[in-house]
Amino acid sequence: LLAGGVLGANRGAMSMGLYVALGAIGLPFYAEGTGGWTAATGATAGYLVGFIVAAFVVGKMAEHGQDRKLSTSIPAFLAGTLIIYGIGAGWLAYDLGLPLTGAAGEPSAISLGVAPFLVGDVLKALLAGAMLPAAWRFIEDGR
């Protein structure tokens, strides 16, 4: 998400595409130091695609000035997080043959691929959304 906010839509998406491609050819860039074609096309492939799409969307928002103020930057990063979760959980459900949602205690894509990470990811989105406007102010003041 930060790549999109800093680099803009096209460069942000390309940087995430490069990340996915380098991981797919075997570099240990993915979670827990994994990489390779199996990791890139497995159950978590949707999250990798989501990174690319989210970087593009957050980048577009940044190109329209939504990275300059706290009141617009944080929602942009939260939207990016939702995009990653939407694409990722959708693919996870498909790949594992799980329902997207389920009854409490029943396995679902949301319970396995969103719930365990939600608090940490929201905190990271809030932190990035708060830091980016401050960083731009620092950079612009230094000119």
Language-model segments: residues:
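Membrane-embedded alpha-helical hairpins and interfacial helices in multi-pass inner-membrane proteins
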Residues: 65-142
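Short helix-perturbing small/polar motifs within transmembrane alpha-helices
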Residues: 37-86
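Transmembrane alpha-helix boundary and packing residues in multipass membrane permease domains
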Residues: 19-20, 55, 59, 89, ...
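Alpha-helical membrane segments and adjacent membrane-interface helices in multi-pass membrane proteins
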Residues: 1-57
